A protein has these predicted regions:
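Surface-exposed amphipathic alpha-helical tracts and adjacent flexible/coil segments at the periphery
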Residues: 1-184
Length: 184
């Protein structure tokens, strides 16, 4: 068996069945996951549930967006696990090429000060690079990094050190706790 190489559980396409079954609390797998993964999955499920409760047709119309968001933050293919019976061999991954993530987590906005945004950087990015602001309401806003500054206010061309605390100028308004990511 390939017990440590199973597909990831994903029920985004089955929100109606889960709600109709009386499920009113959803738990995502967050152990050993990045903040980007947890934020993306939680935001996407929240939007899917809200859309379904508002109008099932809206939920169906937005399905491509839900699938895209979930698939862009994971390392694995998906399965419905035991929800609809015993999983088949299709629920396992038998090759080693399972990496499907298409976004890199850059950091989270921790503070706004003098028109700049403080982050604790997680992966390298540079001035002039196009990144995305991932907002809680489901919007993804593409912006160009206008400036990067260390904590003393010195200008930098890039942020090369993981967990480096710095300030960035994105030329647009964003909120504390918005996430930053880069498409790969």
């Amino acid at each position: 068996t390939y017990i440590f190489n199973s597909k990831g559980l994903c029920m985004i396409e089955h929100i109606p069945e889960m709600i109709d079954a009386g499920i009113d609390s959803f738990k995502i797998e967050g152990r050993m996951k990045t903040a980007l993964y947890v934020a993306t999955v939680a935001r996407t499920y929240r939007k899917a549930i809200d859309d379904y409760l508002e109008d099932p047709k809206k939920y169906e119309a937005n399905m491509p967006w839900y699938r895209d968001q979930i698939s862009n933050c994971t390392y694995r293919q998906f399965t419905t696990g035991f929800y609809f019976g015993k999983p088949s061999e299709e629920s396992q991954i038998y090759d080693s090429n399972t990496y499907i993530r298409e976004y890199t987590y850059l950091g989270i906005i921790g503070e706004i000060k003098d028109g700049l945004y403080r982050i604790e950087q997680r992966n390298k990015f540079s001035v002039g690079e196009v990144i995305e602001i991932m907002k809680p309401d489901g919007q993804n806003v593409a912006v160009t990094v206008k400036g990067i500054y260390d904590e003393e206010g010195n200008s930098m061309e890039s942020a090369p050190h993981a967990q480096q605390k710095l300030f960035i100028d994105l030329g647009t308004e964003i909120q504390v706790y918005d996430l930053l990511r880069r498409a790969e």
